[in-house]
């Protein structure tokens, strides 16, 4: 450890020799036992106040407590008689994921502080505390007998690093007349003590929260978010060198373990989302170093929207996701309030990110580049577009990069004359310029909204481009729409149809329901799309859950000859299918259970020969209720009916439990209707005829509601399969529907890559009739 020892000679003389064993007077090793912490000197046990079960994770040595930033803290009663009033050392090992929120409305130019550890009573001028500000400033305050009670404060000359382990040490030495604050062994502040004794407090010690209570709605905002590994107090004045050597090089893992949600009926298992806290738009879907990556809007301090960071999850297969460390965090003058949405793109110089940097008064576009192929660490490269062009709304955000005709462009969401639009910025001579051009704009606020969020441009081939955008304040609220068109020589967009089309099938998406703000990426000949599917729950419920929102399953998209978007499930999802399966192939009148397939992670796939009456699936089924997806052959309407399901309602007003959409193309009598449904906790992704799709959030409350069935009210030929899904299941066939592909033949044999064998191989894995076998 590199330690700058700049203590005064007098203080050095008072210090014990380096390497001597030091006995603490207070020690928390931060091991969680039955939801509590033990102070090892007094053997006192103190409950961890927490909305969800208190958790420990791997620390520097042993365990560390995971503080969620909005609900959990410890209040401990320690006797002051055990502590010296002349010589003290307070030592903490911790790793902040983010800094305390303190203010949800704006970034604090004058920082306020939350207690990490201490029992400071400022009014009575007693006690001490190590504190951390909303901007990462460290502070140590202690009470002294000077002038019959005086508060001394040391402010650190360095900020506490985010996302890594650090050691904070505060040293008080009355005889040397010096107090010192250390960060990772380096002295970062001192003050004189006026040769006065320390005034201790009999008040409770707080760990992870200030003694005062500051809230935004139900959420505490003067709290610590991250890991605390160890807290110790010594009745000696020690330098960091005299404390036990600690290796701080390991990367802290801030992910909440699955046990945090063990009792949840709603937590998805194979949809992308962070391990806790708030997520909003996912952006920057890309591929690097053997993994898919999604970047997204994240508030780690709690499941509410404030001071957004760029979160990061990765996956090898688009269904088993791992959260990575925060990629980009506020901290520069231009993004002190938040790092908002943008995109990730790959150009001649490799992977880049551009994002919306927000201070308290202006939005700018900033570039960042990764430090590694895993895209874990990023370096900000500064402002590339310094605010909106003249004549546009102050709302200016969500940049997106594309290239056309040998030129590079960035479009940014905005509003012009009260209608949604996108600016156009061209890369010329090392700068992003705007000559007043608008990339594309709406013509009617009722249909096209007043502001455009999350614009996205995708080259669909044959000179056609897909432009998706999420307008605010349309006549039906927020939903995602799209145009198909061409790029003009000057970089502007010309649509091939005047009116936009809806991303989600048949108007299901309105008022902010359904899939919004898609991120699109092309790889291996596939164009993949996924987006945020908001839960539409009140903040009090998110407080109880510990998380807010998740993303859709990936969809494979393409265009038909009429420039309509075709959507079907990503074929790789078939690898989650377990051996728990059911099949029905017969003329059906009535209902048949799909047992043993049941639970909250299931796939239902059926082809129905259209005749008369209604047909479809039931799921979340119990003796007392169910969710029903049904197609009515008379009017061509597909309905998801939740009115008979015991649930936490999230759609009162817009839907009241009934999601109905007329199919764009009604199958004729004798034709096939294909329904493909993925259920995962509180989300259903529904695909129809491999053409149309929508995603819905559902929050069932009946623990026993796990059954599935297929039904038809009139005699209908059905060919149905169902599976229980498991994201941890290894292996991927690449073949999603051999069982119902007549052209494939009943006896064809495939390898794991989907290539056909002429005969059963002598060795290795092969697939016959949709099942895996191993020849040896």
Q: Each predicted region: which residue ranges?
A:
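C-terminal tail/sorting-segment detector
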Residues: 3, 765-776
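Beta-rich accessory regions
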Residues: 256, 488-511, 519-731
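Bacterial Sec-dependent N-terminal signal peptides
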Residues: 1-23
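Beta-rich carbohydrate-recognition and catalytic domains
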Residues: 241-398, 402-447, 461-511, 531-583, ...
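Short, glycine-anchored, charge-dense loop/turn motifs used at functional sites
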Residues: 690, 752-755
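Terminal processing/anchoring signals of secreted or surface-associated proteins
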Residues: 1, 21, 732-738, 754, ...
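Extracellular glycan-associated modules
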Residues: 22-259, 588-605, 612-648
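Residue-level detector of functionally pivotal "anchor" positions at catalytic/ligand-binding pockets or at interdomain
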Residues: 255-256, 726-753
């Amino acid at each position: 450890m590199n330690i700058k020892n700049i203590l005064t000679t007098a203080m050095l003389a008072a210090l014990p020799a380096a390497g001597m064993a030091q006995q603490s007077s207070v020690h928390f090793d931060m091991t969680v036992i039955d939801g509590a912490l033990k102070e090892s000197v007094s053997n006192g046990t103190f409950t961890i106040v927490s909305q969800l079960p208190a958790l420990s994770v791997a620390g520097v040595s042993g365990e560390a407590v995971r503080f969620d930033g909005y609900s959990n803290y410890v209040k401990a009663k320690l006797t002051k008689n055990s502590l010296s009033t002349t010589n003290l050392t307070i030592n903490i090992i911790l790793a902040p994921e983010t800094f305390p929120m303190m203010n949800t409305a704006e970034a604090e130019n004058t920082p306020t502080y939350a207690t990490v550890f201490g029992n400071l009573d400022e009014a009575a001028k007693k006690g001490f505390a190590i504190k951390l500000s909303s901007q990462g400033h460290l502070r140590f305050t202690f009470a002294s007998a000077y002038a019959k009670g005086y508060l001394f404060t040391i402010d650190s000359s360095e900020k506490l690093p985010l996302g890594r382990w650090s050691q904070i040490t505060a040293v008080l030495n009355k005889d040397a007349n010096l107090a010192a604050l250390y960060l990772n062994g380096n002295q970062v502040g001192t003050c004189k003590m006026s040769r006065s004794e320390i005034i201790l407090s009999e008040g409770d010690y707080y760990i992870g929260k200030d003694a005062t209570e500051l809230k935004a709605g139900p959420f505490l905002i003067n709290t610590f978010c991250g890991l605390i590994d160890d807290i110790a107090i010594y009745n000696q004045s020690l330098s960091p060198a005299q404390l036990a050597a600690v290796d701080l090089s390991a990367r802290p893992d801030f992910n909440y373990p699955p046990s945090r949600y063990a009792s949840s009926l709603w937590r998805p298992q194979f949809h992308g989302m962070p391990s806790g806290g708030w997520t909003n738009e996912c952006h920057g879907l890309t591929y690097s170093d053997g993994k898919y990556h999604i970047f997204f809007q994240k508030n780690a301090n709690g499941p509410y929207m404030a001071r957004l960071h760029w979160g990061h999850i990765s996956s090898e297969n688009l269904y088993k996701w791992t959260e990575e460390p925060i990629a980009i965090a506020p901290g520069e003058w231009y993004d002190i309030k938040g790092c908002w949405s943008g995109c990730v793109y790959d150009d001649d110089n490799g992977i880049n990110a551009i994002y919306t940097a927000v201070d308290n008064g202006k939005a700018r576009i900033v570039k960042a580049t990764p430090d590694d192929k895993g895209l874990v660490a990023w370096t900000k490269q500064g402002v590339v577009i310094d605010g909106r062009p003249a004549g546009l709304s102050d709302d200016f955000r969500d940049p997106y990069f594309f290239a056309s005709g040998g030129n590079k462009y960035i479009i940014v969401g905005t509003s012009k004359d009260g209608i949604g639009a996108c600016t156009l910025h061209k890369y010329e001579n090392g700068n992003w310029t705007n000559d007043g051009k608008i990339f594309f704009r709406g013509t009617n606020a009722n249909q096209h909204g007043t502001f455009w969020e999350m614009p996205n441009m995708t080259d669909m081939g044959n000179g056609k481009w897909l432009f998706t955008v999420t307008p605010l304040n349309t006549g039906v609220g927020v939903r995602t729409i799209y145009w198909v068109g061409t790029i003009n020589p000057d970089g502007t967009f010309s649509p091939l149809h005047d009116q936009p089309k809806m991303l989600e099938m048949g108007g299901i998406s309105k008022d902010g329901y359904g899939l919004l703000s898609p991120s699109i990426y092309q790889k291996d000949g596939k164009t993949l799309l996924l987006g945020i599917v908001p839960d539409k729950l009140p903040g009090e419920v998110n407080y109880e859950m510990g998380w807010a929102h998740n993303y859709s399953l990936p969809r494979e998209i393409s265009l038909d000859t009429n420039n309509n978007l075709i959507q079907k499930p990503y074929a790789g999802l078939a690898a989650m299918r377990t051996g728990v399966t059911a099949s029905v192939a017969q003329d059906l009148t009535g209902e048949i259970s799909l047992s043993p397939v049941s639970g909250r992670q299931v796939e239902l796939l059926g082809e129905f020969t259209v005749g008369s009456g209604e047909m479809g699936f039931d799921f979340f089924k119990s003796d007392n209720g169910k969710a029903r997806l049904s197609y009515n052959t008379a009017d061509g309407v597909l309905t998801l009916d939740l009115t008979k399901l015991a649930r936490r309602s999230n759609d009162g007003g817009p839907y009241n439990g009934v999601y109905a959409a007329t199919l764009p193309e009604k199958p004729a009598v004798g034709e096939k209707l294909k329904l493909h449904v993925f259920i995962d906790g509180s989300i259903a992704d529904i695909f129809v005829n491999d053409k149309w799709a929508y995603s819905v959030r559902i929050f069932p409350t009946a623990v026993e509601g796990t059954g599935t069935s297929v039904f038809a009210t009139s005699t209908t030929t059905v060919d149905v399969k169902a599976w229980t899904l498991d994201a941890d299941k290894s292996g991927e066939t690449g073949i999603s529907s051999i069982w119902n592909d007549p052209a494939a033949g009943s006896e064809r044999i495939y390898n794991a890559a989907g290539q056909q064998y002429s005969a059963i191989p002598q060795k290795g894995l092969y697939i016959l009739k949709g099942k895996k076998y191993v020849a040896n």
